[in-house]
Structure formats: structure tokens, C-alpha cells
Amino acid sequence: DTLIANPRHNSLSYYADGSHSRWCWCDALFMAPTSFARIGKITGEPKYFEFMDKEFQITYDSLYSVADSLFFRDTRYINMREQNGKKVFWGRGNGWVTGALTFIIDNMPAQHPSRVFYISLFRQMLKKISTLQDKQGFWHSSLLDTASYPMPETSASGFFTYSLFWGLNHGYLEKEEYLPIAKKAWNALASVVHEDGKIGYVQPIGADPKKVDICLLYTSDAADDS
């Protein structure tokens, strides 16, 4: 309620004063909007959805590449390029967003005028992301430069696998097109689960693509640290 009553107007440029008090990095779209959406559903008060929607769309305007149907991690990466000359789109960062969209759509009232925006965004992103799956069924740290990041990355792959199955189960994705992709991703993830329940090939904590040169073992909630 304090945030809603005292909205911030700082620039979302990453190094601008006060930018971190707003959702200036794509991970934040999982951290904050999902909570507002859930509170809005529990209380039934429109103000939580109104604030969430306004702030989300400001971040969307700042970080979403319409041409690529993917989010930059933050404004620092908009003009950066990978070794192959492609834009820098972080796998896990985009996973945070697709995961967030499932919660927002699930909790937002069916009649809310912006709900169609989130459904459309979800479909756009999953359509693009599905084309970036590798032959094994994984996604990589950098979505557009798998040559520089040849090892699979399972925190991004986990987010995308969840998002695919959620979209299928809720009728937002066509089974004929997306079910084979989702099953392939699930089987890929299952293949790197160790006997002790830990999963391999998780990128370390960070804010951008990093190489997974060894089989890093994390518990399933390691991604909570971003």
C-alpha cells in the first residue's frame, strides 16, 4: 500500500539514480508483479492490479524487444552484442518473465482489460523461445549465441519447461505445436537429475549469460537467488 500511495518516477536506465527502486531489470518482473497480482486476487481490490499493470508495462516498454520477442536483462544490455554479433538475451532472465506471466494471468480477473496483453505476451515469448531449443531439448545461457555457451543451462530450461506445460494445460498454447517441445524439454531436464536429487548444468548466480563449464550442482530452489 505504501508503494502504491507513493509511486516512484525514476528512470529505468540501470545506472540512473533511484532506478533500483523500480522494476528496472527483467528478473524483477517475477519478484514484484506476481506478489501484487496475488494480493489483488486475495483482497479483490483493483488497486493492486492497476499498480502492477502500470509498472509492468513501463518495464516492458524499456526492456522488451518487439523484434525478438525477448527481454533484455536491463538497459545495459540493449546495445551489447555476443561474439557472434547477436543481441544479448539471457536465458534465465527470460525464464523469470515467462514464469511471472503464468502467475499474472492466473491471478488477474478474466474481465481485466489488460489480461489480453499478458496472454499475448506469453504466447509471443513462448513462440520465439521454442525456436531456440537445442537438439537435446535444453536452452542455453545466451539464447542467441549457443556457440559461445555450448553447455545446456537448466535454470532457464526449467522455467521454459514449466511455462510450456502451464500454457498447454491452460489452453494458451496449441498442443500439436508445443507438446512435443515441452516433452523434449522435460526429458532433457530429467536426464541431468542426479541420484541425490540435485540437477546439473545450472549457471551460477549472476545478471547475464555465463558459461557452464562444469556440471554445477544446485538444489531446485537455487534460482531464487537469481
Regions from the PLM with identified roles:
Residues 13-18, 74-87, 140-148, 216:
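Acidic/His metal-coordination segments adjacent to aromatic residues that form catalytic metal sites
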Residues 196-212:
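A glycine-biased, small/acidic residue-tolerant capping/turn segment at secondary-structure junctions
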Residues 1-13, 46-73, 119-137, 181-198:
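Long, well-ordered core segments of solenoidal/helical folds
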Residues 1, 31-45, 96-114, 158-173:
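Well-ordered alpha-helical scaffold segments within catalytic/enzyme domains
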Residues 218-226:
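Conserved small/polar residues in nucleotide/adenosyl-binding loops
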Residues 79-80, 84-135, 139-143:
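Aromatic-anchored, glycine/proline-accented short structural segments
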Residues 23-34, 88-103, 151-162, 181, ...:
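Aromatic- and histidine-enriched alpha-helix N-cap/loop-to-helix transition segments
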Residues 122-182:
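A beta-strand-loop signature enriched in Asp, Gly, Thr, and Trp
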